Amino acid sequence: MRNYRSPIGKMTPGVEVDREAPVVRAATVAEGADVAEQHTGVGHQRGARPWPLPRRIATLSVHTSPLHQPGTGDAGGMNVYILEVARRLAEANVEVEIFTRATAADLPPVVEMVPGVHVRHIMSGPLGGLTKEELPGQLCAFTAGVLRAEAVRAAGHYDLIHSHYWLSGQVGWLAKERWGVPLVHTAHTLAKVKNAQLAAGDRPEPKARVIGEEQVVAEADRLVANTKTEAGDLIDRYDADPTRVEVVEPGVDLARFCPASGDRARAQVLARRRLDLPERGYVVAFVGRIQPLKAPDVLIRAAAALRQRDPALADDMTVVVCGGPSGSGLERPTHLIELAAALGITDRVRFLPPQTGDDLPALYRAADLVAVPSYNESFGLVALEAQACGTPVVAAAVGGLNTAVRDEVSGVLVDGHDPVAWARSLGRLLPDAGRRAMLARGAQRHARNFSWDRTVKDLLDVYGEAVAEHRTRLSDFATCSR
């Protein structure tokens, strides 16, 4: 491989390092896409890998299982990420064993998710009744279960550990020392970032989590960030070594999330019938866990503000809130229903449980707009899924949403969470069919730049580099010890 200086300062052999920027692994230009519309403008392309693929990976996901339904409890975008990545790693002949906490008595110890991917349930604490915030007290039991599972294997069974979220990173830190393999870590969310952008009345993340994240950042061989924004947070807020931070953008299942064939208006009507939504008028959908961080209340308040601004338009709009309570939202599971009643817009708000199978793409196609008003997102898979279905997104201009949505191309980014500002954006977009059609076309083009196949290709580069560097350190140590 030719030595060169990356445009953003990646350390390559024999080259001076720019410590102010991480690596961005950019996608190649999608077939038929406009180069000017590519979401990532920096990075480097690689030829054949100069290192072997890892044979087997231990994936750690303490607090949530990829088998759980996204949109309920603690299951969300991270579940989708782990599931989609594991499937495609198996297709690339890399075995994946996912370790997660057992949460029900009827769960088998091991589930084969697809050939080459196994989910192993680790007994650690009570099966039910523990919140994510209470799980640090069970990390010792979980770690013991992981180490015992590996102890019956032949030495060198795993080539690498990939931990997800800080709880798993703590387990991975110990396992990497015990097994003598590199640790790759993806944070998915960061306490310091969440605490800097708290919703009103939401609980701040505890100091113990901040300390735990700092420890994992210091110990991981590679840190995978979803976007350049998250990479910057790791470097600036957690003092991560930029040469160990790699940006690998998540993807979307373009076969599942795609525009309906045929006439769009007819397809929208059919999707609304499927979900028992009004066939006429406008539909604005929120999809996600019901918790202050995701800010579904901002959308409901915006609907009420729109009624003050344009009563006729507001009465022609239905807000759909799709998801289940999670996190601090569990403390007030009926809060949004009560809020809609207090604002006098109960007749304009519909609540749906998390959607599975073909019903989730149908919901995106049924909507005229999908709203993502979160206070923070490391990426925002919902925004990407909606755009892949050809539905423009109105999103808060925070975190990874600045990457997931291209402002005025695939949707609209709103500064802040003022319901009046959100009502203004909705009021401008909904009646303007021409502008929404333009954004719908841009949304499809933008989403085509993301795929899980590309994500896994880039992750394999990260894995290979981590394994190669680890083996070099071992070789150097052995040489020095002679």
UniProtKB/Swiss-Prot annotation:
Protein's name in the database: D-inositol 3-phosphate glycosyltransferase
Subunit structure of this chain's protein: Homodimer.
Family affiliation: Belongs to the glycosyltransferase group 1 family. MshA subfamily.
Pfam families, per database record: Glyco_trans_4_4, Glycos_transf_1
Domain of life from the UniProt record: Bacteria
Residue positions binding 1D-myo-inositol 3-phosphate: 63, 74-79, 132, 165, 189, 209
Role of this protein: Catalyzes the transfer of a N-acetyl-glucosamine moiety to 1D-myo-inositol 3-phosphate to produce 1D-myo-inositol 2-acetamido-2-deoxy-glucopyranoside 3-phosphate in the mycothiol biosynthesis pathway.
Reactions catalysed according to its record: 1D-myo-inositol 3-phosphate + UDP-N-acetyl-alpha-D-glucosamine = 1D-myo-inositol 2-acetamido-2-deoxy-alpha-D-glucopyranoside 3-phosphate + UDP + H(+)
Any one GO molecular function term: acetylglucosaminyltransferase activity
UniProt binding sites for Mg(2+): 364-365, 367, 391
Record CDD domains: GT4_sucrose_synthase
